[in-house]
Design a protein with these regions (language model features):
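Helix-start (N-cap) detector for alpha-helical repeat units in TPR-like alpha-solenoids
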Residues: 23-24, 57-61, 94-95, 128-129, ...
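Register position in tetratricopeptide repeats
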Residues: 35-36, 69-72, 106-107, 140-141, ...
């Protein structure tokens, strides 16, 4: 996010070279303050610049970066207002659209996020992040055909996209197309150690968890357990691995082991209330 703010300001400085020096200095000071995580100071500089030249077209950039600062401070509604003000000035500003879409999604406003990602794709049809995120939203909304279309468009642009392939595998699983999901995940896992892929151990752990989930749906419990063990060995913080394994243990009447895994998931950040029913079944 810091890189986005910095490059956005530099872009503005190039596009609008006729700013007064003071306005320019305030913009640059805001960049420096943001890079040093002095967010309140950065906000102060931006507000001074906006007040100094309220009609300056460069204010689209200032409002967008003000929104990002407010977002980092968890002032989400103010951040949305700032992104919207930026887009009122520059409706085709892709960084502002992407930032607002991401914030809408975080706030659970999926339809508004989808609209912004669609606007980005109207402007830049090969924007991979917008395709990925819109596909994710479509999948959450059970619009599986639209989701698949976006994943396939993404994978034509970037055939090795980790998130695109994983997303498509998840979609196939949700549609009950387990063999298709396994085919994708098997291929991704088989690439481990190859020159074509540079994935982290955490990313590989996610793949093993994803495959275990498909295997669980297929009632291949032994295979699922093997993949979950591998996932935890690669990354012991994989919350989903403990949840799936706990559910398998519970189905096998191994209540103490199930309880241990659910408690581990809680220690990793899963709200205890979300697992209350499962924990009650462990008694």
């Amino acid at each position: 996010m810091k890189k986005l703010i910095f490059s956005f300001f530099l872009c503005g400085a190039t596009m609008f070279p006729a700013f007064s020096q003071t306005y320019q200095e305030l913009s640059e000071r805001a960049v420096a303050a943001t890079e040093q995580d002095s967010l309140s100071l950065a906000e102060k500089y931006i507000e001074q610049a906006l007040k100094m030249e309220p009609a300056n077209p460069h204010n689209a950039l200032l409002f967008s970066n003000l929104g990002t600062i407010q977002c980092r401070q968890h002032r989400y509604e103010q951040a949305l207002d700032s992104y919207t003000l930026a887009l009122n000035i520059a409706p085709r500003a892709i960084p502002a659209l992407m930032n607002r879409a991401a914030l809408y999604l975080e706030l659970g406003k999926d339809d508004l996020a989808r609209i912004d990602y669609s606007l980005v794709l109207d402007i830049e049809s090969d924007n991979q992040e917008a395709l990925l995120m819109r596909a994710y939203i479509y999948m959450r909304q059970r619009n599986y055909n639209f989701a698949k279309s976006d994943y396939e468009r993404l994978l034509k642009l970037a055939p090795q996209s980790y998130n695109g392939r994983l997303g498509l595998a998840t979609l196939e699983q949700k549609e009950g197309k387990y063999e298709a999901a396994l085919s994708i995940l098997n291929a991704m896992i088989a690439e481990k150690g190859g020159e074509a892929t540079r994935l982290t151990t955490q990313q590989y752990a996610v793949l093993y968890v994803a495959r275990a989930g498909v295997e669980q749906d297929m009632k291949h419990v032994d295979l699922a357990m093997m993949d979950l063990e591998e996932a935890i060995k690669l990354d012991a913080s994989q919350t989903e691995a403990y949840l799936i394994r706990g559910q398998i243990y519970l189905s096998q009447k191994k209540k103490e082991l199930a309880k241990r895994d659910f408690e581990k998931a809680i220690s990793l950040g899963v709200p205890q209330g979300d697992l209350r029913d499962l924990l009650l079944q462990c008694k």
